[in-house]
Curated annotation (Swiss-Prot):
InterPro entries: Calcineurin-like_PHP_ApaH, DBR1_C, Dbr1_N, Metallo-depent_PP-like
Keywords assigned: Cytoplasm, Hydrolase, Iron, Manganese, Metal-binding, mRNA processing, Nucleus, Zinc
Cofactor note: Binds 2 divalent metal cations.
Lineage: Eukaryota, Fungi, Dikarya, Ascomycota, Taphrinomycotina
Entry protein name: Lariat debranching enzyme
Length: 463
């Protein structure tokens, strides 16, 4: 399968799809800062200085004027319409053919098992519950996109192999498995964090060591970086270790990776160059990006053969982080990954992952909507035990009844952008019908509450 990988999106979709179609990709994955703004009232849900807020391209995919020509999946970053994404904590369609992976999730796409987690790490909020709600105050606007231990623990309980792991943040220590000298020449202000072993997320470091996916894709730090992690050299302490044989100048050693494309495509002017400063050790880099001109795409292609199943002694993770959509930046790659199961021709078939559904059922009693995580989270071994019990329910009620297919049930909640909606209007809180349907499907909610009706499109012409 030809997988297009995009770094930070920042609301630029039209030109991205032009590029992805030219590259004939089967699937597009985006590493966050997607900015699914439906109308200008969603500005109140995004953490960003007002002068950099712009509606972007997404609203025309939400209102139906445009449709994504390629199946697109993404995780959330630290610049998102958090009020919209919060309607879909388990994931769901934000527009036709554009799928958000939720706070954390695993799905199967065309035979590839893809896991993902949204947000960035903050020690201050990591152990908190999900207490945020509209209208957001300044603190909530930050904390809502911070990764929680609940989601990391849920993912750590996975035991089946992962093909692709998608995150916004980098796993801490990953730079030691690539060309760290080159990274520091390009981003010298990372040096102190590298020396402190503080570049990236310690929570994602734990996930990388625990899950050992074939590929890990990320964004956030606005630079291209590749690395290869040999897990046989890792200590069993949840941390990345590094030996001299791990560090290479090339990271990915695939042919064609460093061959730039000669294509030129127009790109919208980028108005979201600066980070809203919050003390997070990685967000300050966004201040550096100010150049605006015609885009020269630096698309690379990685070709790889189908890899055999690896034993725990020789597992390898190939890491790829990409830049954001700006001229002369390496923000897009095409990676060819052969699925374990070859899908039928046509659009990749999407399914819920049975193991992940078991995890959701096992972890449901521990969901917290208060600032303190209440009830306390169980140990990883307890979660795995609970998951094994829930696997029986999932197998009997979903797998054997062929109910794992992800429905194409996108539904507008907030009204699409129009002149009647102004920037000073606070967004409303909505119960998304997709979330209700999903909770009913996996047995977290009884079918007793009617889903809210779809929002009528104000631009629709009634004959």
């Amino acid at each position: 399968m030809r997988v297009g990988v995009q770094g930070c999106c920042h609301g630029i979709l039209d030109n991205l799809y032009i590029l992805a179609e030219k590259r004939k990709v089967d699937l597009l994955i985006i590493g966050g800062d997607f900015q699914a703004l439906r109308n200008v009232s969603d500005y109140h849900g995004i953490s960003m200085p007002p002068k950099f807020k712009r509606l972007g391209d997404f609203f025309n995919y939400y209102n139906g004027r445009n449709k994504a020509p390629i199946l697109t999946i993404f995780v959330g970053g630290n610049h998102e319409a958090s009020n919209y994404l919060d309607e879909l904590p388990y994931g769901g369609w934000v527009a036709p053919n554009i799928y958000y992976m939720g706070r954390s999730s695993v799905i199967n796409v065309g035979g590839l098992r893809i896991a993902g987690i949204s947000g960035i790490y903050s020690a201050m909020d990591y152990k908190k519950g999900r207490y945020e709600g509209l209208p957001y105050n300044y603190k909530m606007l930050k904390s809502i996109y911070h990764t929680r231990e609940f989601d990391v623990l849920s993912l750590k309980s996975l035991q089946k192999p992962i093909d692709i792991f998608l995150s916004h943040d980098w796993p801490r220590g990953i730079e030691q498995h690539g060309d760290v000298a080159k990274l520091l020449r390009h981003k010298p202000f990372f040096r102190n964090e590298v020396e402190r072993n503080d570049l990236g997320s310690p929570a994602l470091e734990e996930l990388l060591v625990e899950l050992k996916p074939r590929y890990w894709m990320a964004a956030h730090l606005h630079t291209k970086f590749t690395a290869v992690v040999h897990h046989n050299s890792q200590e069993d302490d949840g941390k990345l270790s590094c030996s001299s044989k791990d560090v290479t100048s090339s990271g990915f050693s695939m042919k064609g990776l460093n061959e730039p494309s000669q294509e030129r495509l127009p790109v919208e002017k980028e108005q979201n160059d600066k980070s809203d400063e919050e003390g997070s050790n990685n967000e300050q880099e966004e201040k550096q990006d100010k150049k605006q001109s015609t885009n020269r795409d630096l698309c690379r292609k990685e070709s790889c053969k189908k890899e055999p199943s690896l034993s725990s002694s020789d597992q390898v993770t190939k890491f790829l982080a990409l830049d954001k959509c700006l001229p002369r930046r390496s923000y897009f790659e095409v990676v060819e990954i052969e699925p374990v199961e070859i899908p039928d021709s046509g659009a990749p078939y999407m399914q819920y992952d049975s193991e992940w559904l078991s995890v959701l059922r096992a972890m449901h009693p521990f969901q917290s909507h208060t600032i303190e995580q209440d009830p306390p989270l169980p140990s990883l071994e307890v979660v795995k035990t609970l998951k094994r019990k829930e696997e029986i329910w999932v197998d009997e009620n979903l797998v054997k009844k062929d109910k794992l297919g992800i429905p194409r049930n996108f539904c507008q909640t907030a009204p699409p952008h129009s002149r009647d909606i102004t920037e000073n209007m606070q967004p409303s809180s909505y119960i998304n019908p997709q979330t209700v349907a999903f909770e009913i499907l996996i047995g977290l909610k009884e079918r007793t509450v009617d889903s809210p009706p779809p929002v009528k499109n104000p631009n629709e012409i009634v004959l």
